[in-house]
Amino acid sequence: MAKYIFVTGGVASSVGKGITVASIGRLLKARGVRVSVQKLDPYINVDPGTMSPYQHGEVFVTEDGAETDLDLGHYERFIDVNLTRLSNVTTGQIYSAVIQKERRGDYLGGTIQVIPHITNEIKSRIAAVARQTGADVVIVEIGGTVGDIEGLPFLEAIRQMRKDVGRDNVLYIHVTLLPHIGATGEVKTKPTQHSVMELRRVGITADVIVCRSDYPITDEIRDKIALFADVDVEAVVPLHTVDSIYEVPLVLEEAGLGAYLTQRLGLSASRPDLDDWRDLVARIKAPKRKLAIALVGKYVELHDAYISVVEALRHAGLHQGVDVDIRWISSEQIEEEGCEPLLHDVYGIVVPGGFGDRGIEGKIAAAEYARVNNVPYLGLCLGMQVATISFARHIMGPESRANSTEFDLHTPHPVIDFMPDQLDITDKGGTMRLGGYPCKLTPGTRAYAAYGVDVVVERHRHRFEFNNKYRRLFESAGMIVSGQSPDGRLVEIIELRNHPWYVGTQFHPEFQSRPDRPHPLFRDFVAAAAKTFREGDQRPLPLEQNGAVTEHEPHSR
């Protein structure tokens, strides 16, 4: 029988539950324990696919096409496992399922209530993870903060789980914040005491308290928390703020959490092997030269909107021995000020995914700037599409008004257009091309050199695609289709022939990058940027003109 670790949060949101859960998964995996992870989100949306990035951050897409919480990205990167739609459950999903069953008559005329119908549905989703993955331990994070009204059904469900599967098979971890009072220099425990009491009111007694703090906590503070929370001192685990999230598993291991969980759950575990992880952290902390990379987007005020892109860049930088210095550039600011003041000193440009026409001309300008000035460029989803639009306007002239039908339904040159199977779809949620699809690579291209295989599977999230009516024109002018669907109908990767490194992907490679195994395209993109950086950018830079190549003065960065 699988065992379950339930992780709740107290005092404040964003205390680091997701990273804590991912780190616990890493500690157990290092002991040979089979682990799976699940996130329970109390919001009423069915999934985050239609939510504003400003409210939710990134939408992480799983291999099987689920639009999920960004914490699943942390789980995958730390534990190195591909999760499925089972790993993210929302209140919207639970109520939708229960109402559908009621409409079918599954409840035989009974009165549908939160207990037992909603809680039973939640418990069935939790059990499904263990059943379908064969995990020894399922770690379940409950989103939000203890005391939130929308989280009560989830807390009741995990309370019942201890009775359903046996007390020895369930463990509760409470992640809480210890605020620091600057005026007195004290770390305060009172909010944690109250948070533990709030958890007890719903019938859950925490077995472990993980104490988040910006400062190291003393043994005296641990003793005090242990007394009021009624746990072993060993179960009060300090977790102070660190420079890199990848240090967290080592901090928790040093605090004895891995050994404590193994003992409390009676797991058959081997000696922990964290040597590779320690080496990873040592390389992260080693001094490195900074490499400026611009990330041009419309949600740059909230870095979590692009968290997988950020992590993929860091993974690639670590592999290349450089510290990627991300310059957050608003595409709307480019529209106002132009590219030169904002991009003149960067060595690579990334344009990530997005939707809507706000700031779109700034993204197109960034793609054009990278092409003209031979700055290494990586376009992701929309970033590939704006590169296509930029190239179309270059070879056909700005008066062509080449565009995507997403931004101009009446453009005379729709070089990016609706996918045929999207034309009759009116609903927004869960209706895009989602999840992993195969991509056949073209030998002799940068994409093929990066991957080193003929066919790859990458994750998608889009409604629009390259318009194949323009494919022959583009290829004759110097844009190569270096990846396509196996049937040849969908362009997946484009790149420029006469450029140091210019690649756009219709998919999202950032979702499959790992700290110890950077994604091949990010790896080679950062390598190209680092090469420019190390050479001092003194190369002559060719400027394409309708397929021809001319020389102009080196661009100064």
Curated annotation (Swiss-Prot):
An example molecular function term from Gene Ontology annotations: glutaminase activity
Biological-process GO terms, alphabetical: 'de novo' CTP biosynthetic process; pyrimidine nucleobase biosynthetic process
Enzyme class label: ligase
Cellular compartments per GO CC: cytosol
Keywords, alphabetical: ATP-binding, Glutamine amidotransferase, Ligase, Magnesium, Metal-binding, Nucleotide-binding, Pyrimidine biosynthesis
Lineage: Bacteria, Bacillati, Chloroflexota, Chloroflexia, Chloroflexales
Pathway listed: Pyrimidine metabolism; CTP biosynthesis via de novo pathway; CTP from UDP: step 2/2
Family under the similarity heading: Belongs to the CTP synthase family.
Activity regulation behaviour: Allosterically activated by GTP, when glutamine is the substrate; GTP has no effect on the reaction when ammonia is the substrate. The allosteric effector GTP functions by stabilizing the protein conformation that binds the tetrahedral intermediate(s) formed during glutamine hydrolysis. Inhibited by the product CTP, via allosteric rather than competitive inhibition.
Assembly, per entry: Homotetramer.
Residue span of region Disordered: 536-557
Protein name stated in the entry: CTP synthase
Active site per UniProt: 381 (nucleophile), 508, 510
Binding sites annotated in the UniProt record for UTP: 13, 188-193, 224
UniProt catalytic activity: UTP + L-glutamine + ATP + H2O = CTP + L-glutamate + ADP + phosphate + 2 H(+); L-glutamine + H2O = L-glutamate + NH4(+); UTP + NH4(+) + ATP = CTP + ADP + phosphate + 2 H(+)
